[in-house]
């Protein structure tokens, strides 16, 4: 139905531009809607026919009419199910669509109303039938006739509706045939339109091809234009480069020519000045040399003294730093000890509170027991008279029992001695073989640590504390001495700096005084600044030391307080340990939620204690975190001080450099007119200073680069290590969380097992009680088996038989021998038992320090009646083992002497009555857990120690940084120390990682042990199940025996009644025999008296037995009454169920009878149905023929619809293609216009940009060329000066040599002739000497070689300057070579001067 409704029809085509096209589309849509409605009606007709056939078979239900009407309604209004605005065609307006939709909805409402009326009529008819059937004698024939009539009416109405629907469908078929003819005409029209559209598409495709060709041509033109622009730009760039190179060459030539002119002029001036200033310069240099030697010697002596003092003080400071690091390590160890002690004291305080609460509970229980005891003593006094007769019989039994008790006590004492010996052996084996397996070691550590070892540990701790105090005193004294030395050294340094004379006196005399004064002032200011900075640093460090001392003193006081508290708690614990023996240690059980609902219960108090403990642990953690924060703050402050000092040093260096540059500038300005000697000396000194500075800068830069590389590598290495450690720590935390989860699951399973075991134990104890009661009854019934035989026997034999029966009863269950005497007393002491259970419950809640499984209870005796009252051990033993659990955490710390208090002794003596056997399995488990705690705490302590040891190393490193760096190597020393400290930290972190891995392994081992223990507990649970099954079988047997005993008791009561009758008969016989002779009477009387005595004795015995049996019978009667009540309840339930079953059977009979009547009705209805089916088959044949016609019409319709849809889709596609092509054409035209405009704009913009870039490049080139020219001028001037200096020195050396020669060959006649010749020729004397003097050939060759070398050097420098860019290193090497030559020449010059003198 849904497939044929208009909602599933394909969507209408889009609106065309032409009106003819829209009208055709509208008509097609209308026709499509009419066809879909016709198909919907046809489907409805088919379904009505199917419904009719179904209704004939389902006439009993009365719902076929409703189903058929509902489907017909759905067929009438198929459009109503479609969504709003999606089903009407495009030709209709929205208002018309709304009107049609409202009409359809009204039709649906009317159909629904008709259906509702039919449903109500059916309902009323069904209710009327139900009322008739519920009558006492219903007329089934009338009801059946009514139903048949009702169904006939329904079938007639349905037939009418079917005929109406068929008529409607015939009319619609005719309409559809008319629409088919219309559609065929439209298809012909569409085919014609298709041909027209194809022609239009071909024309448009041709146009598209033409446009694409035009577009390609224009794109090629744009590319060609771009390539032309790029080629022009490249040509412009090449032209600009060539012009720049030519400019540079011309400038270099101009500068060279200018430099040559300046050099020539300078040489002339230089030669003239040198001739006049050589003599004066030599004298000044000699004086300066003498003074410089004296000053250097004095400076060296001072320098040696100061260096020795510095070395001594550095060594002392290093020793102090080492002492401080050791003290810090010791302090951190003391802090760890303090933390452990604080945790231990907190645990002990909790224990003391628990013990006090237990004290109060025990006192209350003891008072209650005293009250009960007084009441019981009164009852015992009343029963004393009754039990006096039974005393003789029970005396023998008591003697035997006492002997057995003594034997058992001896056995227990022997076992305890054996246990003590075994423990001693285990301790010895632990000392000799520490490499035992973990399971054996855990089982062997159940004993407590000896007192001697703890006392030795306390003594060693005291000695360590005294040693640390002495070290602190020594360190304080050294610090005070260092302060005084530093102050003396700073004063001496200031005096020395004030007295230092100036070294440099090689400058001219005019600016010397001002320059020397400025240098002295600068040095004084520098010294004052250094002194102030050092004083500030000293004050800061003294403050830090004072703060550290205060902190150490406070921690020391806390330690002492903790030691006192620890001793007091240890003494109290030792008292408990001495009073009680060895006992098991158990963990506090967490209370369940249902136990916390009571306000004043033990569970609530235990939960409060647990939360208090956790709060204390969190407080301890908070304190540790605060300490770590304080340490980090201290490190931050130290880092800040180091950063400030480094910044200060950098600022000082910068100031020195600026001051030196300023001084050089002032000196240049102050001496514009110098002599030739002063200028040469200054140039030499400048060159020397520049060389030294260059070398120092190079060395420092290399060192700094190397150090920076090393530091970067170390930082990267440390970062990788840190990441690795962080990942490891995260993995370990995850593993720990998983282990904790597993342990929690295991504990949860254990708690569940414990609850199950306790329930089983209670069942076992009840079964054992019943068994012991049955056995006691059996033993007492055996005494009453044959009373006639016992009446003839003497009293001694009766007593022996009673003893033997008691012994047999004892041998039935060997393990319960000690408790059978207390059987009757236990029944009377129910109130005392209750008080015991209260006390044991409180002990259970407060003593479970470890969560232990109760598997060990299987080893306890099976038939003990006191097992419920003595399930838990002595209070003193529990307290001892809780102290043992705490003592391993301390690792055998100090234990002191312990005083015994009377209250605790009394309490322990009172509680020792409730002690039972020691349990081994839980003890081993508790020791395992204690060892785990020990290992975990040791590892955490080692981690803390490692971290704390890393912190002093860091402090030491940063203190070493704070030392004033007076040499250039101080920075390298500090970096090396930092590297060493980082390596130490790395090693410590590696150790911590190994410790964590070991702890994880131990946790895994502990988990495996817990799993093994769980398996053991499961095995024990299975064995307990088996024992329970055995006990149930024993119970069944005992119940049978009980029934037999009851029968015997009844027979014994009959025998007692016969004995009473015999005594009554004997009394009249005695009266009758009194008339006889006296002798026979006396004899008979004596015999009768003896018999009576025997009978009375037996009667008293039997009466006492009967009384006990009566008491037991009363108890059994109570039990039987309870069972009778249960049975009566069960019988009532059974009777109620029987009544229900009878009612159900009666109803079943009634229903069967009604079913028979209904079956008869069904047979009649089936006959009618057969006749109707035959009619329906005939109708079906006619309907099938109509269906075939409809199918043929529908197929043709579907074919035409497909053809129509295909043509529509093709037209839509072509329209879309046309629209897309038109849009593309428009886009291409707009794009072409845009491209042309953009190309023109881009070309203009590129031209402007190229102009701007060229202008900027020209400016940059000009500035760069100017800089390069200035640099080349500077280099050439420097080179010329160097070369002129070399020439000058060589010329001076030659003149000196000539002076030597002239002195040797000096004559008055030659001298006069030379003067005359000079005056005649107008030549100076030196020129004349040059003319006259003929030099040696070797010297001439040397001078030529030197000149050639100088020219080659100049050409090499010019090539470097004109060559490619990386030429700085080569230029520097060439200049350094020339400077070295100048140095050598100056040294030769000075040697020649000395020789001339």
Curated annotation (Swiss-Prot):
Required for centrosome cohesion and recruitment of CEP68 to centrosomes. It comes from Mus musculus (Mouse). Interacts with CEP250 and CEP68. Interacts with NEK2; the interaction leads to phosphorylation of CNTLN. GO terms for molecular function: protein domain specific binding; protein kinase binding; protein-macromolecule adaptor activity. Residues 95-126, 405-481, 674-778, 973-1114, 1152-1299 form a coiled coil. It is found in: Cytoplasm, Cytoskeleton, Microtubule organizing center, Centrosome, Centriole. GO terms for biological process: centriole-centriole cohesion; protein localization; protein localization to organelle; protein-containing complex assembly; regulation of protein localization; single fertilization; spermatogenesis. GO terms for cellular component: centriole; centrosome; cytosol; nucleoplasm; sperm head-tail coupling apparatus. Keywords: Acetylation, Coiled coil, Cytoplasm, Cytoskeleton, Phosphoprotein. The modification N-acetylalanine is found at residue 2. Residues 485-503 have a biased composition (Basic and acidic residues). It comes from the Eukaryota. Residues 1-43, 56-76, 422-449, 485-521 are annotated as: Disordered. Phosphorylated directly or indirectly by NEK2. This is Centlein. PANTHER family: CENTLEIN. The gene is Cntln.
């Amino acid at each position: 139905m849904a497939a044929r409704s208009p909602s599933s029809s394909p969507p209408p085509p889009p609106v065309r531009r032409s009106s003819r096209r829209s009208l055709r589309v509208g008509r097609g849509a209308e026709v499509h809607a009419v066809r879909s409605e016709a198909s919907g009606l046809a489907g409805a007709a088919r379904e009505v026919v199917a419904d009719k056939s179904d209704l004939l078979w389902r006439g009993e239900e009365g719902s076929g009419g409703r189903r058929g009407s509902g489907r017909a309604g759905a067929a009438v209004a198929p459009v109503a199910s479609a969504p709003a605005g999606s089903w009407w065609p495009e030709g209709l307006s929205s208002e018309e669509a709304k009107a049609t939709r409202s009409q359809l909805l009204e039709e649906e409402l009317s159909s629904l109303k008709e259906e509702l009326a039919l449903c109500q009529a059916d309902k009323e008819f069904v209710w009327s039938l139900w009322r008739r059937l519920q009558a006492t004698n219903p007329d089934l024939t009338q009801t059946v006739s009514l139903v048949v009539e009702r169904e006939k009416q329904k079938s007639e109405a349905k037939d009418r509706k079917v005929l109406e629907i068929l008529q409607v469908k015939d009319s619609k078929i005719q309409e559809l045939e008319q629409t088919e003819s219309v559609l065929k005409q439209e298809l012909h029209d569409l085919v014609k339109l298709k041909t027209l559209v194809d022609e239009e598409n071909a024309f448009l495709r041709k146009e598209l091809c033409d446009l694409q060709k035009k577009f390609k041509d224009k794109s090629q033109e744009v590319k060609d234009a771009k390539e032309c622009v790029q080629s022009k730009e490249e040509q412009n760039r090449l032209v600009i480069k060539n012009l720049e190179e030519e400019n540079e060459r011309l400038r270099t030539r101009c500068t060279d020519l200018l430099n040559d002119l300046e050099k020539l002029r300078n040489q002339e001036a230089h030669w003239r000045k040198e001739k006049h200033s050589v003599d004066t310069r030599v004298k000044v240099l000699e004086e300066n040399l003498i003074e410089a030697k004296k000053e250097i010697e004095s400076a060296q002596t001072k320098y040696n003294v100061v260096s020795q003092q510095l070395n001594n003080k550095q060594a002392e400071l290093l020793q102090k730093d080492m002492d401080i690091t050791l003290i810090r390590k010791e302090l951190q160890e003391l802090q760890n000890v303090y933390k452990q002690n604080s945790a231990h004291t907190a645990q002990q305080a909790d224990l003391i509170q628990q013990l006090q609460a237990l004290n109060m509970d025990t006192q209350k229980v003891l008072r209650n027991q005293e009250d009960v005891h007084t009441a019981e003593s009164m009852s015992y006094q009343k029963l004393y008279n009754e039990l006096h007769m039974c005393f003789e019989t029970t005396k023998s039994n008591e003697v035997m029992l006492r002997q057995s008790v003594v034997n058992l006590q001896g056995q227990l004492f022997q076992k305890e001695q054996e246990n003590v010996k075994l423990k001693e052996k285990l301790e010895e084996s632990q000392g000799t073989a520490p490499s035992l397996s973990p399971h054996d070691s855990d089982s062997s550590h159940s004993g407590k640590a000896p007192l001697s070892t703890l006392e030795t540990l306390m003594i060693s701790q005291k000695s360590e504390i005294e040693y640390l105090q002495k070290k602190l005193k020594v360190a304080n004294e050294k610090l005070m001495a260092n302060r005084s030395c530093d102050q003396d050294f700073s004063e001496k340094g200031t005096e020395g700096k004030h007295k230092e004379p100036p070294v440099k006196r090689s400058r001219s005399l005019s600016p010397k005084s001002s320059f020397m004064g400025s240098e002295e002032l600068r040095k004084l200011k520098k010294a004052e600044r250094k002194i102030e900075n050092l004083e500030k640093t000293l004050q800061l460090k003294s403050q830090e030391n004072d703060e550290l001392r205060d902190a150490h003193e406070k921690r020391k006081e806390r330690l002492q307080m903790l030691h006192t508290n620890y001793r007091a708690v240890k003494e109290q614990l030792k008292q408990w340990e001495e009073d009680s023996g060895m006992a098991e240690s158990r963990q506090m059980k967490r209370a369940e939620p249902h136990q916390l609902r009571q306000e004043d219960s033990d569970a609530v108090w235990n939960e409060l204690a647990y939360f208090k403990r956790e709060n204390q642990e969190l407080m301890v953690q908070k304190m540790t975190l605060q300490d770590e924060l304080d340490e980090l703050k201290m490190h931050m402050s130290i880092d800040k001080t180091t950063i400030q000092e480094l910044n200060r040093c950098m600022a000082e260096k910068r100031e020195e450099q600026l001051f030196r540059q300023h001084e050089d500038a002032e000196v240049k300005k102050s001496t514009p007119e110098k002599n030739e000697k002063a200028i040469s000396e200054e140039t030499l000194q400048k060159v020397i200073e520049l060389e030294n500075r260059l070398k120092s800068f190079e060395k420092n830069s290399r060192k700094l680069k190397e150090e920076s590389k090393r530091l970067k590598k170390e930082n990267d290495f440390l970062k990788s290590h840190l990441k690795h450690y962080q990942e490891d720590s995260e993995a370990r935390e995850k593993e720990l969380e998983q282990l904790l989860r597993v342990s929690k699951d295991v504990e949860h399973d254990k708690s569940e097992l414990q609850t199950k075991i306790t329930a089983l134990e209670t069942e076992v104890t009840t079964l054992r009680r019943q068994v012991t009661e049955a056995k006691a009854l059996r033993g007492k019934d055996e005494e009453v088996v044959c009373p006639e035989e016992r009446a003839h026997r003497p009293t001694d034999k009766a007593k022996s038989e009673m003893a033997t029966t008691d012994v047999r009863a004892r041998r039935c269950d060997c393990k319960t021998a000690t408790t059978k005497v207390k059987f009757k007393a236990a029944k009377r002491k129910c109130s005392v038992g209750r008080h015991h259970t209260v006390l044991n419950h409180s002990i259970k809640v407060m003593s479970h320090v470890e969560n232990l499984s109760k598997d060990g209870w299987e080893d306890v005796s099976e038939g003990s009646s006191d097992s419920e009252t003595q399930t838990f051990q002595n209070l003193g033993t529990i307290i001892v083992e809780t102290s043992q659990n705490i003592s391993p955490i301390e690792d055998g710390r100090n234990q002191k002497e312990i005083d015994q208090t009377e209250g605790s002794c009394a309490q322990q003596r009172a509680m020792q009555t409730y002690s039972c056997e020691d349990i081994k399995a839980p003890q081993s488990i508790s020791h395992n857990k204690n060892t785990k705690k020990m290992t975990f705490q040791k590892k955490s302590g080692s981690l803390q120690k490692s971290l704390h040891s890393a912190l002093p190393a860091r402090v030491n490193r940063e203190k070493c940084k704070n030392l004033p760096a007076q040499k250039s190597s101080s920075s390298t020393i500090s970096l090396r120390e930092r590297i060493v400290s980082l390596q130490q930290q790395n090693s410590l972190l590696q150790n911590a990682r190994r410790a964590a891995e070991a702890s994880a392994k131990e946790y895994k081992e502990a988990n495996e042990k817990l799993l093994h223990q769980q398996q053991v507990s499961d095995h024990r649970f299975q064995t307990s199940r088996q024992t329970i099954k055995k006990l149930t079988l024993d119970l069944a047997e005992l119940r049978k025996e009980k029934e037999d005993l009851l029968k015997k008791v009844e027979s014994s009561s009959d025998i007692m009644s016969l004995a009473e009758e015999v005594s009554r008969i004997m009394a009249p016989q005695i009266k009758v025999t009194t008339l006889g002779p006296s002798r026979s009477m006396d004899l008979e009387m004596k015999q009768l008296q003896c018999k009576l005595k025997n009978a009375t004795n037996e009667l008293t015995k039997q009466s006492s037995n009967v009384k006990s049996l009566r008491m037991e019978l009363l108890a059994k009667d109570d039990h039987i009454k309870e069972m009778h009540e249960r049975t009566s309840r069960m019988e009532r339930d059974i009777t109620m169920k029987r009544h229900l079953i009878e009612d159900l059977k009666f109803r079943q009979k009634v229903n069967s009878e009604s079913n028979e009547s209904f079956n008869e009705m069904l047979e009649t209805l089936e006959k009618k149905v057969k006749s109707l089916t035959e009619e329906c088959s005939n109708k079906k044949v006619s309907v099938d023929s109509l269906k075939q016609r409809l199918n043929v019409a529908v197929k043709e319709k579907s074919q035409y619809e497909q053809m129509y849809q295909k043509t529509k889709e093709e037209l839509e596609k072509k329209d879309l293609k046309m629209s897309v092509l038109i849009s593309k054409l428009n886009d291409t035209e707009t794009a072409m216009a845009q491209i042309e405009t953009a190309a023109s704009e881009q070309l203009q913009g590129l031209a402007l940009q190229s102009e701007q870039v060229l202008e900027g490049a020209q400016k940059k080139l000009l500035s760069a060329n100017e800089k390069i020219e200035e640099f080349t001028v500077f280099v050439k001037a420097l080179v010329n000066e160097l070369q002129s200096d070399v020439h000058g020195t060589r010329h001076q050396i030659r003149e000196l040599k000539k002076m030597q020669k002239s002195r040797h060959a000096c004559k008055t006649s030659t001298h006069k002739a030379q003067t005359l010749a000079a005056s005649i020729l107008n030549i100076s004397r030196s020129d004349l000497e040059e003319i006259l003097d003929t030099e040696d050939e070797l010297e001439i060759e040397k001078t030529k070689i030197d000149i050639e070398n100088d020219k080659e050097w100049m050409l090499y420098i010019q090539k470097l300057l004109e060559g490619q860019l990386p030429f700085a290193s080569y230029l520097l090497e060439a200049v350094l070579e020339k400077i070295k030559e100048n140095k050598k020449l100056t040294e030769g010059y000075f040697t020649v001067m000395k020789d001339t003198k």
